[in-house]
Amino acid sequence: KVIETFESMGLRFGRDVNAYTSYDETVYQVSLPTTQKQNLQQVMAIFSEWSNAATFEKLEVDAERGVITEEWRAHQDAKWRTSQARCPFLLANTRNLAREPIGLMDTVATVTPAQLRQFYQRWYQPNNMTFIVVGDIDSKEALALIKDNLSKLPANKAAENRVWPTKAENHLRFNIINDKENRVNGIALYYRLPMVQVNGEQSFIEQAEWSMLVQLFNQRLQERIQSGELKTISGGTARSVKIAPDYQSLFFRVNARDDNMQDAANALMAELATIDQHGFSAEELDDVKSTRLTWLKNAVDQQAERDLRMLTSRLASSSLNNTPFLSPEETYQLSKRLWQQITVQSLAEKWQQLRKNQDAFWEQMVNNEVAAKKAL
């Protein structure tokens, strides 16, 4: 019936109606093509039912087992195998290492409707929920709809949302991922470090410093590859990824040209050592700041044209991560003022902090185990 209701509004699953579950949250998203009160009321009624009165009929549960199992099987490729081989290193000492968000297939095959209902009643409760409405709708009207449909939901006792502290692995590790379907041979250095929780000006600056270091490395690496200075590397990147509510990983990866792992490893270590000794130039930093401020200013000037789904995603992220939500104008003005405190000296200190971090591991992705052993 829910599917029929959504389709009667012109909505399609996957395009307009979506949901996802990660390690830490479940998010339902509905994008309406109109703000007609009748449609809004119907959607709110569905959300109310999902929030308190979801059913777990045996036939539906059994059908969903097959859907989840097929989804799991469809992802058993080289990318998945690589992720599985990396997880013991990347997710060490986190609860995320125990299982993927999709769950364990033994559990999927055997869990009963009663167990699902118990889990749902423990976690999927209104007091664990944030409801976000974005669109061309009067805020008072939207608030009234929320109150009419959700305020009468019973305040059942929900499980406490605990944060399990991540313990550092303070020693260097080595990981070889050998898969015959890997298309490139590459080498990477991963660092694990506490997540910056942005709740004030100082943490705002610190997060920007980490982000700028990643951008500066990427910018320099790409310039040197394109100019032909780095002949043993065909590509590379630096990125920062969240690995737990309180922890992140910052990594540097390069792809070996002609599968020459030894030369690629030497090139990456040389690039890192150059930054160790000389850092980044004032010109490089000014260029990154200027580019970012231009992008932020464009966001201010183009607010009327911004994508509502992106805005919804930003609001959801702010709620899920318990961080302040800033408007484009606030973000631009705050960045313009606070980034003046970011200098090549402060970035050099942040870089040295990273490089002295012992919670790190080298990783090689290869399709030839002999090449990997030679490089190590």
Role assignments for model-derived ranges:
Residues K58, R65, R117-D148, K356-W362:
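Non-catalytic, conformational "gating/processing" segments within enzyme and secreted inhibitor domains
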Residues N93, T130-N185, L193, E369-L376:
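An aromatic/glycine/proline-enriched structural segment found at the starts
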Residues T130-G135, E283-L376:
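C-terminal regions of mature proteins
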Residues Y28, P88-M129, N161-P165, L193-S203, ...:
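Histidine-acidic residue clusters that define the catalytic metal-binding segment
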Residues V30-E64, R224, K242-D301, R337-Q341:
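M16/insulysin-pitrilysin zinc metalloprotease superfamily fold
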Residues V67-R86, P165-N185, E223-S234, E283-P328:
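Short acidic/His-enriched helical or mixed secondary-structure segments at domain edges of catalytic enzymes
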Residues K1-S31, A98-I102, Q215-Q248:
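M16/MPP (pitrilysin/insulinase) zinc-metallopeptidase core fold and M16-derived inactive scaffolds
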Residues K1-V2, L189, G200-N218:
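Active/ligand-binding-proximal structured segments within catalytic/core domains
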